[in-house]
Amino acid sequence: MIRNLLLTASVLALTGAVSMPAQAQSAAGAYLAGRHAAVRSDFAESAKYYGEALALDPKNPEFLESTVLALLSLGNIERALPLARVMAASDQPGQIAYLVTTAGMAQEEDYAGLIAQSADEGGIGPWVDGLVKAWAQVGAGDMTAALAQFDALSTEAGMQGFVMYHKALALASVGDYEGAEAIFAANQSGSAGQTRRGVIARVEILGQLGRNEQALALLTDSFGANSDPELDDLVAALQGDGQVAFTQIPDAKAGIAEVFFTFAAVLRNESAGDYYVLLYSRIARYLRPDHIDDLLLTADLLENIGQYELAIQELQDVPADNPAYHAAELGRAAALRRSNKPEQAIEVLQQLTRSHGTLPSVHSALGDALRAQDDFKAAIKSYDKAIELTPDSNPQRWVLYYARGIAEERLGNGEASERDFRTALEINPDQPQVLNYLGYSLVEQGRNLDEALNMIERAVAASPDSGYIVDSLGWVLYRLGRYEEAVDQMERAVELVAVDPVLNDHLGDVYWSVGRQREAEFQWRRALSFVDPEDQDSEADPERMRRKLEVGLDAVLAEEGAEPLSKASAEK
């Protein structure tokens, strides 16, 4: 539909401009400006221009829908709502109108209206409509009808676990904790009950039932040594004398918000477009502003589509005393880094080390930010602290050793780097990134080439579609003098990552080694065309590529004092 709107507007603007009245031309121009802004995911600009077009042509259904969609994407549902109600009253209201009017009725706690709307044709979709109706029946006080609605939905294939999860939450929201726990205990909630929110909901339910030891065991089983302020607060409450409150879904409006959050998470896991997922997360955020998990999801979606300032605005809404404050600040730092504001990101993370200095994730994030700025010494200190704070039982410790190893390697500390990589492999023996990095490093040093080959072959087996790892395999075969075998691997690597200068350069070297000089020169020229002079971290060496084009690889190796190709594998 959106594409059709764009094509229609293009026809209006390009083929009908001569005969259209001036006002119609202005409306079409504003609409096209809105479309251009929407393509950039600039929701504020698109809402502005669509609004101008709509003001000039209030009855145009395309202008109306586009304006509502832009306002919903921007999170301005209050402004979108009256326009969506106009759409809903038309002959063809569409899904966007149902999304916004449903949000409006839920916000107003018009449960009778929601129940009546669900009986109409159309709607958002059968699962969302069905769950919203069930929660509306909870809000209307008709628990019998609500439970019957949940049960009816649960007979349909595909989403039974999510339906039963919501049924458990609905029971808990009205105080039937025994009924809610029975659903969780029977594992009827499926994967939804195993998410972080699902586990915390069940822990709170067990706390309401006075089964604190079971709740504590569930936390340990689910999160192990991975703790954070929210989990720490929950543990403290369970170990104390008071009763743990059920906060996950306190009422029916929160339940409807959870429907939209649940489906946003499902859609994202199914690789739906971030723009589409954002519509659902925006509604959840509108209905429940304190839904921190949805806030973090919304910010992440905005960051992924390049709307860094909007993402930062969302994250700044989390107060400093909220248990999720550190997560929001980590997200804000990530958005600042992606918006080319690394110094500000580092400032945020440094402040976080002062306010939340006991969290390993804070120090590791600072290490990553410093490493990206080539401040390897400071990065190593941050990784040191993160490793010190991370329990030995945490299986994710390998990431810290891997990151520190990279920083050590960039400083030229070969022994320390290799030691960290090998420690990472002791923790996670088949981790392809570590196997590849260490194997490739050994190849570049001309050491332990047989061991390097074994490591990289294992890495390729684990990640066969990673062009960089396949390149490493081709390169070690080349260094071992197994040139014909290297060709197949290098060609495969370039198929996977066609525009990388290093991979194309490597393929050129391999072609030269088997006598395919013209193809080698072609690859070196391709490699040169892909070199980014602004990329200081790239291994690409354009001067060496040019020299190879001038005199050939054999002459370059001789100039460098390297072994000729026929003897390249002599030292292992």
Question: Predicted segments — roles?
Answer:
Residues L234-A237, D241-V266, R518-K572:
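Terminal, low-structured helical/coil segments at or just beyond the last alpha-helical repeat
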Residues A24-A30, D57-L64, S90-L99, E121-V132, ...:
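Generic helix N-cap/helix-start motif at coil->alpha-helix transitions
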Residues E52-A55, V86-A89, D120-G123, S154-T155, ...:
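Conserved structural position within tetratricopeptide repeats
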Residues R35, L69, A103, W135, ...:
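Residue-level recognition of tetratricopeptide repeat
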Residues A38, L72, A106, V138, ...:
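Position-specific recognition of the canonical hydrophobic site in helix A of tetratricopeptide repeat
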Residues S41, G75, E109, G141, ...:
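Residue-level detector of the short coil/turn that links helix A to helix B
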